């Protein structure tokens, strides 16, 4: 059933109809469309378009339809309706007859779809926030269980300074906390109702839009009808949050892919999140993590695509805006799936402490400690930096770690070096000295874990 047609003397070409129809993807707004229609029916009572009895009849029919949709959503795609709005209205008319044709009074598909999409976004943000916090909790739990797992930290993929696996986990907790904050901020801005703005100029009926917004669970109603029907900032904001969030998950995946290699050997992934090779029997591939990393690109593409769709649109509504949904649906679905999958990866991960410790003791990760030791003895840092660089070259030449160089050899580089240098060069000392807020010392890591646990509840 088309919601328009009186103006036309020819039927739409079937090829155009298929090109124009959006039911194949906006069917996902069915529940929101029905909920919005119930609220609109109540508003029509307040302006005398519907009687209380008519509204009750419509609400009952819409409630039955809502249950039908939840029980068998695939029925929607069996229809040739243009979009979800015409499908819902057609089903309503089937149930209540001519009364169903009164429901659209004073309403446009422009404010209707804007409302539906915002309601869907609110529901989906709630799911994303839950999944985000679940992953944060999984990371905090993994950190708590691995506070003593010393491993190399990297810059430029070169061993830099010793850290702990717990500290690594907590770095991603911080990223996810920012993602959570971005979602909460976006939610505040999208929590305004456009329903009652009509096609672009507002509705001709004196409907209390603030009351209507409250019925739908919005914090308030929008203030400008022209902006309301053409606003898709909430789509851009959520796509941006998803793009940033997926970058974080991609980096998380890349780190663990590297940690899982035979060359690093810091972790072993569970069989539940890995796959084998059709040719090589020995293979255990980190497919879950590789897919998280790979799916990042499609989310970035959705954001870029939506930016380009909106950049040249005049006010108010244009059919281009139909392109807002597929990318948004896919991007947020992808982000949600990847959050769940990242948590599943952590659920069965094994941290190989001996190998982590061995790697942390290699690569002269304690060189900075020797420089700090010299500074404490009164040597200017730049000079100390140069001295330690020369000492590292000699240690490499001899194939020894710094702490295995005899004192007389170390003193060739600086006479201020004494026997007290050796405890300073231990891995534990390297960690203990990073005791400022945010550092890798056991005390700071324990405090960070406690803070995250309290925040997450």
Swiss-Prot record:
Pathway noted in the entry: Amino-acid biosynthesis; L-arginine biosynthesis; L-arginine from L-ornithine and carbamoyl phosphate: step 3/3
Main location: cytoplasm
Source taxonomy: Bacteria, Pseudomonadati, Pseudomonadota, Gammaproteobacteria, Enterobacterales
InterPro entries linked: Arg_succ_lyase_C, Argininosuccinate_lyase, Fumarase/histidase_N, Fumarate_lyase_CS, Fumarate_lyase_fam, Fumarate_lyase_N, L-Aspartase-like
EC number assigned by the record: 4.3.2.1
An annotated Gene Ontology molecular function: argininosuccinate lyase activity
The organism of origin for this protein: Shigella sonnei (strain Ss046)
SUPFAM superfamilies (alphabetical): L-aspartase-like
Name assigned to this protein: Argininosuccinate lyase
Keyword line: Amino-acid biosynthesis, Arginine biosynthesis, Cytoplasm, Lyase
Catalytic activity: 2-(N(omega)-L-arginino)succinate = fumarate + L-arginine
HAMAP family recorded: Arg_succ_lyase
The gene coding this protein: argH
Family assignment from sequence similarity: Belongs to the lyase 1 family. Argininosuccinate lyase subfamily.
Localization, UniProt: Cytoplasm
Superkingdom of the organism of origin: Bacteria
């Amino acid at each position: 059933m088309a919601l328009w047609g009186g103006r036309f003397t020819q039927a739409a070409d079937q090829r155009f109809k298929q090109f124009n129809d959006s039911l194949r993807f906006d069917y996902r707004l069915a529940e929101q469309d029905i909920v919005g229609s119930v609220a609109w029916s109540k508003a029509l009572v307040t302006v005398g378009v519907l009687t209380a009895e008519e509204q009750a009849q419509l609400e009952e029919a819409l409630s039955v339809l809502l249950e039908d949709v939840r029980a068998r959503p695939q029925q929607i795609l069996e229809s040739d309706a243009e979009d979800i709005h015409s499908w819902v209205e057609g089903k309503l008319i089937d149930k209540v007859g001519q009364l169903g044709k009164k429901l659209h009074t004073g309403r446009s598909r422009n404010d209707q779809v804007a409302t539906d999409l915002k309601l869907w976004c609110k529901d989906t943000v709630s799911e994303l926030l839950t999944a985000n916090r679940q992953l944060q909790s999984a990371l905090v739990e993994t950190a708590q269980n691995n506070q003593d797992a010393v491993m190399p930290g990297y810059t430029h993929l070169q061993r830099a300074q010793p850290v702990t696996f717990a500290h690594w986990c907590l770095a991603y907790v911080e990223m996810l906390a920012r993602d959570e904050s971005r979602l909460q901020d976006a939610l505040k801005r999208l929590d305004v109702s456009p329903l009652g703005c009509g096609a672009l100029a507002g509705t001709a009926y004196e409907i209390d839009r603030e009351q209507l917004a409250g019925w739908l669970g919005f914090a308030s109603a929008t203030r400008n009808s022209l902006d309301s029907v053409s606003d898709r900032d909430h789509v851009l904001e959520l796509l941006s949050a998803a793009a940033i969030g997926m970058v974080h998950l991609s980096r998380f995946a890349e780190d663990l892919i590297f940690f899982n290699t035979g060359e690093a050997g810091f972790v072993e992934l569970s069989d539940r999140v890995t796959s084998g090779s059709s040719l090589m029997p020995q293979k255990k591939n980190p497919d879950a993590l590789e897919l998280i990393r790979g799916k990042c690109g499609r989310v970035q593409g959705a954001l870029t695509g939506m930016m380009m769709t909106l950049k040249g649109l005049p006010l108010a509504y244009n059919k281009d805006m139909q392109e807002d949904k597929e990318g948004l649906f896919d991007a947020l679905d992808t982000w949600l799936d990847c959050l769940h999958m990242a948590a599943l990866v952590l659920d069965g991960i094994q941290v190989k402490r001996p190998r982590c410790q061995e790697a942390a003791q290699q690569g002269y990760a304690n060189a900075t400690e020797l420089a700090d030791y010299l500074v404490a003895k009164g040597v200017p840092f730049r000079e100390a930096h140069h001295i330690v660089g020369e000492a590292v070259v000699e240690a490499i030449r001899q194939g020894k770690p710094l702490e295995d160089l005899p004192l007389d050899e170390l003193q060739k580089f600086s006479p201020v070096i004494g026997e007290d240098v050796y405890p300073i060069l231990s891995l534990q000392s390297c960690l203990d000295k990073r005791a400022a807020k945010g550092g890798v010392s056991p005390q700071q890591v324990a405090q960070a874990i406690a803070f995250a646990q309290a925040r997450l509840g």
